[in-house]
């Protein structure tokens, strides 16, 4: 009842019973009762009750008149507080809002029906509450509105509050006494409000009961724990039961168990866990009989067989000869259905995997019961000591045990699948957990900026499409910005987009450009129904991160005569386009579209029937995104997945991942996230892990040696000063890292690429690679090869600590294999590794350092790196091998004429250009990187697991979680990573794609590209040559590159190849060749800055600057002078005396750059300079001592500097052992290796000509002197000794010098004249091996080579391969002249046989002397094999040589020289002596022409041992 319905105002106008009696209406009522109107049909008692009700509740009908005391108070209040009435009205408005909220709640609760279609505990609860709950809101609202109206009326009438009598008629003014909602509510007697006193009392009682109950439970548990128990198992009966159980177990079948290697060893490879493909078997694993499913009876004796599943009770009647595989498939399906319905569990199936077969003849005879269980090939047979075998038939149903006859009544009744089943009703529960992240991750935020108007809305991504509202494109002439979980993209012109409206609905489908990464296509769409409960799913695109949001659920109802449906979920402006999702099945029902003007109802556009098949999943849309090969399901990951993907065993991490807001307890120290606070655009924070900025620089500072040298040498300082200061230490600070990382935050421009031409460019590049010899690549799964290619000095990863060298220090081969397998599994499953971001500590140009620009490095973690190398290493290695043959230089060496080949590959007379690219790694779009993935997949072997790994790897490369130094894990959406396994190769391919795309866009056919443009790429470096007729190409390249997002300029054009800069080098002409040269300033920076930790490292750095300076003659001369000065300082002079100071001769540098040998003329000129100061009286009586002492006036020639000092620099050598002083030899044979850095000595009293085995002759000339001729850089420059700096003089006394040759030699003479030419002897230093008679002369060796090549009928190139195999075969089997038959060489896994006879027929003098020519190479080959793993030739194994350091000498054609160590010489001689012991060489064979008929005069008795031996009492006779 509504108390406001009680009449009050006009009651005084009602006629009383007394008045009615006067008018003739006789009423049996009290005269004072008033009747509103008289109707004779109404009973009199009703009039009486109405009046009694009015009288009893007249106070409830309104506010009534105010008593005089209250009126005075109110009047005083109104006079003193002018804001009392507005404040009271504000309180009444608040109460009205509260009551209307309650009223909406009651209406929503009562709108839920408990029908059969919506029967749940929730609906039952709501129905009960709606039945018993009382709604006072309507009455309260009426009271509040009346009070508010009366107050406003009083205010509008402007009544003077000083007259209390005027106030008494306004009862609502009682509210001005109260200043709170509770006070006003109590004054107006509003119903349905909480009684806080009663609530407090009930809560106190409940807490007391809860505490008492907890105490009772605790007391019960405490008493239970104190209760004493005893074991009852150790008694006779229990022991008897255990014996019975053991006996029962003994009757069970037994199975052979072992690891793969053991099983393969005993039974064959078919029993390993590789799979059930047929493999080799051996021993008991080989079976001669056929596999049968039934045995011991004839199935044809029975009419049919009934198969029974003991778990489900289902039966199947079939022919006795039915294929058992079909039966097994049938019952597997039945059991899967039961599993899905939770009627059985997997444990049931594991404990009872078999079925039972009943072979039945007729219904009156006994049936044959047979147990069928899955076949186990390793089960031990019951009757024989062997295994069951047949591993290819594993898990197939087969008879187990002997068949048993059973009575007909024991046969189960038929229970075929599909019979009618009746199930019990179960209670309906609330719906369980549901993951809405797949929907939230597909939501995009769309901004359409057209002129000055900007519209913001949401959309839903599906493949290459976005579904959104049509009213987004009220204007379609602007720029569309798309913010998604893929990143931030920009479409410059919305008119280029293809749009498909959904007829009659506020829905439109946008087809994205082809270079937009596709979304996952896992969403489900359907039409809504009235029974659905819906929620609103959204994504909160913040500046620094993206998070998912979800609303409460709401009912939904259709709007008449439209395709809109209404919902009651609160929304805001800009929420249009968010998906409405059904909580019943997770399907998307529509997109939020409209709201009414009062924001009390919202509307969404519903999807039509078959929306997905009609508009989304058609063939045209599938073809639109088919070129995308990366995994779209692994793109929209966030913090939750990152924590789930934390590496597990065998990887061991030492840092934990946390959420961004996961720190509930913290120290009150100020923590600044200096990077996270600046994130924007395509960089989003997804997590946190401990990190710090490494500011320790590898460059320690300025080199004090170099500074001291310049301070003490003014002329040299004038030379070096202009070249110094151009390079500085890179800045390692927070701002530098933020500046470099924020390059990745720029939006990705899509729609600018001509995708048709770009896809054509990909096909052209693939065809080019095939034509150049690029073949199929493999996935490298060999752990040894993977680990050998790792940089063990690098860090393990962001979540790890230490270097790889320490992490894998004690790891076995099996553990390494497990690491590779685990990494591949993570990659296959799409688990992300956390990459480490850091700043590069290096020398950078001064301008970039002043601008605080430092390059960052993003390193792959070990858990991703190993699997990544499995996928990319073989492709990369083949890529390196084709350098310069294809348009790239990756893998080439700039030395040995490599740079000359590069520049000469650019045609002469063309227009050249070195393109300048900037911000390359951060500007690469996902579309470009996906093209690289397509190229790689085109050449990889077919392996579905490998393809998935490779796709996931490149998905992780694009969408990378990077652990930054401030502790934030950042997700990027574009660009390449500098620390991924194939950065250079991928960058090179992308630049090649850009060049091919540009030429195709310019209209040139692929067959004409090389005729008009030649180019080479290395990473982001690009050098081009264009035919003069097509010079205009340069004007268009920048535009086409920018379409792909690449920032390149092509303005530095030239006609001179020497002006080209490529990879920071330019080519200068030297001795007819182009040699690579760095900037002089960059070379001087090596001297200027010190990063070495040991003195020897500093010397190596100076030598490195010498290598780079060759070609700058003046600079090289000054560096050699500096190096010579350094070797005189401590502690470098001690290193020099110990032979540890590296030194590089001029001839070595010439060989390194030009790959040309030093001429004998150059060497002779050096020797002439060495002996040019000998006097005439020494003409015949001269010997050579190596004291190297000179007169004061003699000139000293030093290869280290043009000025003479006492420091001597010998030539380069490949061995650390010097020749004896009594021997001065020069060996000119070619070595297998040619090192640059070699020991040098600075002892002033000894000069030795080392025994060199390099191809570089010794050099005694002054290197880099400006007076030398260009074509004879090793010419001798005679310089006078500076007597003021003579190390041989002390004070005014001169130390006497010995002559190099003395006249006291006794020479052989004829007729009193010496018969030897000492001048020739001084120059005659032949190689020791050339004179040795253990090596065949060169003419014999050449004759042998030609004869063998002719007999084998092969070419010189084929012969070079055969000789490799012959040398290795002879290392193993020796070079004995008694060998015969065939010798073998391996071609992969195949043996190739060659006859030995031609080798021996042409070998003069002996085959061993021929093979002595291969001694040096064989020694190096054995050393190489030992570097890979322990290797001992068969020759050493037979002699039981245990020292592997001597393995290089363990072959019988080893050639001993004076450089052979004494220990090695002794070991080789001992092995040779052991091999030749008891060997007999017969001078004559058996003469077949001599007669053998003669009389045998020997006499033997029965006591003789045999016919050739006499015996006398056990003793041998003579």
Swiss-Prot record:
Record GO biological process: DNA-templated transcription; proteolysis; viral RNA genome replication
Record-marked site positions (Cleavage): 179-180, 232-233, 425-426, 668-669, 1186-1187
Gene3D superfamilies: 3.30.70.270, Trypsin-like serine proteases
RdRp catalytic domain span: 910-1034
Disulfide bonds: none
Active-site annotation: 471 (for nuclear inclusion protein a activity), 506 (for nuclear inclusion protein a activity), 576 (for nuclear inclusion protein a activity)
InterPro entries the record matches: DNA/RNA_pol_sf, Peptidase_S1_PA, Peptidase_S1_PA_chymotrypsin, Poty_coat, Potyv_NIa-pro_dom, PP_Potyviridae, Rev_trsase/Diguanyl_cyclase, RNA-dir_pol_C
Keyword Nucleotidyltransferase appears in the UniProt entry: yes
Name recorded for this polypeptide: Genome polyprotein
Source species of the chain: Plum pox potyvirus (strain El amar)
